[in-house]
From Swiss-Prot:
Organism from which the protein derives: Bos taurus
Gene that encodes the chain: RER1
UniProt xrefs under InterPro entries: Rer1
Assigned protein family: Belongs to the RER1 family.
GO BP: protein retention in ER lumen; retrograde vesicle-mediated transport, Golgi to endoplasmic reticulum
Protein name, UniProt field: Protein RER1
Keywords of this entry: Acetylation, Golgi apparatus, Membrane, Phosphoprotein, Transmembrane, Transmembrane helix
PANTHER family: PROTEIN RER1
Keyword Iron part of the UniProt annotation: no
Residue numbers carrying Phosphoserine: 2, 6, 10, 95
This protein's record includes keyword Cell cycle: no
Transmembrane segments: 41-61, 63-83, 140-160
């Protein structure tokens, strides 16, 4: 293999201009993502704003309903992964039918670890909206369809999926919206005298 045959190398062994450009672009993008990580509320407000702009665009153009339906299903899939635990509790159960000895205390604190963390959920949802927005600029993605049917399909799919997810939460007793272990406060200072 000669010097210039490796990926991204020019004839003289240095990275090509195109390779350096895209590497630098990737570094800038990652830097912006890193800076936005602690600003959860701002990130979601921007995503909701993009979603609102997308909905207005689809409403005004009166088309691209298939793209919108696909975006809705993609967001539903992300949301279910966000609500699901990283390790499925149904896989951790013993398959034995007989009695077994307890191995854990019932009150043991187990933090909820998501299958899809919040930042990755936000990032994927935002990218999905941007891709759908780009699709609305191409007539090839404007497939004629009777949109009320898609709305009904999406509502049915949402209800069935969420019902299954809620049953799973109840069965395995986990709540995906806890922020940590509960702390209990003692009684208020009982030594205070009553005002008479």
């Amino acid at each position: 293999m000669s010097e210039g045959d490796s990926v991204g190398d020019s004839v003289h062994g240095k990275p090509s201009v195109v390779y350096r450009f895209f590497t630098r672009l990737g570094q800038i993008y990652q830097s912006w993502l890193d800076k936005s990580t602690p600003h959860t509320a701002v990130r979601w407000v921007v995503t909701l704003g993009l979603s609102f702009i997308y909905m207005i665009r689809v409403y005004l153009l009166q088309g691209w309903y298939i793209v919108t339906y696909a975006l809705g299903i993609y967001h539903l899939n992300l949301f279910i992964a966000f609500l699901s635990p990283k390790v499925d509790p149904s896989l951790m159960e013993d398959s034995d039918d007989g009695p077994s000895l307890p191995t854990k205390q019932n009150e043991e604190f187990r933090p909820f670890i998501r299958r899809l963390p919040e930042f990755k959920f936000w990032h994927a949802a935002t990218k999905g909206i941007l891709v759908a927005m780009v699709c609305t600029f191409f007539e090839a993605f404007n497939v004629p369809v009777f949109w009320p049917i898609l709305v009904m399909y999406f509502i049915m799919l949402f209800c069935i999926t969420m019902k299954r997810q809620i049953k799973h939460m109840i069965k395995y007793r986990y709540i995906p919206f806890t922020h940590g272990k509960r702390t209990y406060k003692g009684k208020e200072d009982a030594g205070k005298a009553f005002a008479s």
